[in-house]
Amino acid sequence: MSSRKQGSQPRGQQSAEEENFKKPTRSNMQRSKMRGASSGKKTAGPQQKNLEPALPGRWGGRSAENPPSGSVRKTRKNKQKTPGNGDGGSTSEAPQPPRKKRARADPTVESEEAFKNRMEVKVKIPEELKPWLVEDWDLVTRQKQLFQLPAKKNVDAILEEYANCKKSQGNVDNKEYAVNEVVAGIKEYFNVMLGTQLLYKFERPQYAEILLAHPDAPMSQVYGAPHLLRLFVRIGAMLAYTPLDEKSLALLLGYLHDFLKYLAKNSASLFTASDYKVASAEYHRKAL
């Protein structure tokens, strides 16, 4: 089945919403804004560790931490350029200071490098499940079979059973909360990514039919285990769009790997070729 091209836009689809920030008109207002932003960062740390819900998934923390300080910096530069353009004889010298300040964008460059490094995040698929990924591909792309929809056991049911299984093991309250957040996040990412990143070309006509027949139904209530497994092949790329720190990301990956172990343990009942059926000749014409 799911590091950065959307934002969450699993490659092209998921995108984090940008917040609009009002620009202050006075320098003291700018300072107060910056102080407010810095105080916000202090509170964001523990919330990320608790995997607080945020778009594009539920693991993003507060994506608006950096934009406020960035917008304040741009405001300062613009204000410094304006008086320079108004000095009659010094107009040729005025543009020089802003150019020097552009060279001070080292922190931005460093953050971009860190961002690229986080694109290397990979979710490890258990060895027991890798053969099924191959068989799933073969059934659909080579044998031209389709997974029968709606699934006998849909994604929502699988996630609910996993959550109940973890809760029955007597986890502490905060761990139980984390499991609920992880399950909700997996479901959210699945519904967002399915249409653009989790389907083979041959399956797209079937997906279009599902949208017509169930326009208001989340795809997690229609599709099943094979497509859920495909999600974890691509979800590592989507995690690159979240501002989680290293500790929070490691914690999240631990929960995702635990869920994959659950899928591997129950693979015999979740993955079977009998859930596929050869597509009709009419469907083949649609898929061309």
UniProtKB/Swiss-Prot annotation:
**Which is a GO BP term held by this UniProt record?**
regulation of apoptotic process
Q: Which residues form the MRG domain?
A: 117-288
Cell location: Nucleus
Listed Polar residues bias regions: 1-15
- Write the gene name: MORF4L2
Q: Which residues carry this modification: Phosphoserine?
A: S71
Q: Where is this region: Disordered?
A: 1-113
Quaternary assembly: Component of the NuA4 histone acetyltransferase complex which contains the catalytic subunit KAT5/TIP60 and the subunits EP400, TRRAP/PAF400, BRD8/SMAP, EPC1, DMAP1/DNMAP1, RUVBL1/TIP49, RUVBL2, ING3, actin, ACTL6A/BAF53A, MORF4L1/MRG15, MORF4L2/MRGX, MRGBP, YEATS4/GAS41 and VPS72/YL1. The NuA4 complex interacts with MYC and the adenovirus E1A protein. MORF4L1 may also participate in the formation of NuA4 related complexes which lack the KAT5/TIP60 catalytic subunit, but which include the SWI/SNF related protein SRCAP.
Q: What is this protein called?
A: Mortality factor 4-like protein 2
GO CC annotation terms, alphabetical: NuA4 histone acetyltransferase complex; nucleolus; nucleoplasm; nucleosome; plasma membrane
Is Zinc-finger a UniProt keyword of this protein? no
Asked whether the keyword Lipoprotein is assigned, the reply is no
Give the main localization category: nucleus
The function of this protein is: Component of the NuA4 histone acetyltransferase complex which is involved in transcriptional activation of select genes principally by acetylation of nucleosomal histone H4 and H2A. This modification may both alter nucleosome - DNA interactions and promote interaction of the modified histones with other proteins which positively regulate transcription. This complex may be required for the activation of transcriptional programs associated with oncogene and proto-oncogene mediated growth induction, tumor suppressor mediated growth arrest and replicative senescence, apoptosis, and DNA repair.
Keywords of the record, alphabetical order, are: Chromatin regulator, DNA damage, DNA repair, Growth regulation, Nucleus, Phosphoprotein, Transcription, Transcription regulation
Q: Which InterPro entries match?
A: MRG (IPR008676), MRG_C_sf (IPR038217), MRG_dom (IPR026541)
Q: State the superkingdom.
A: Eukaryota
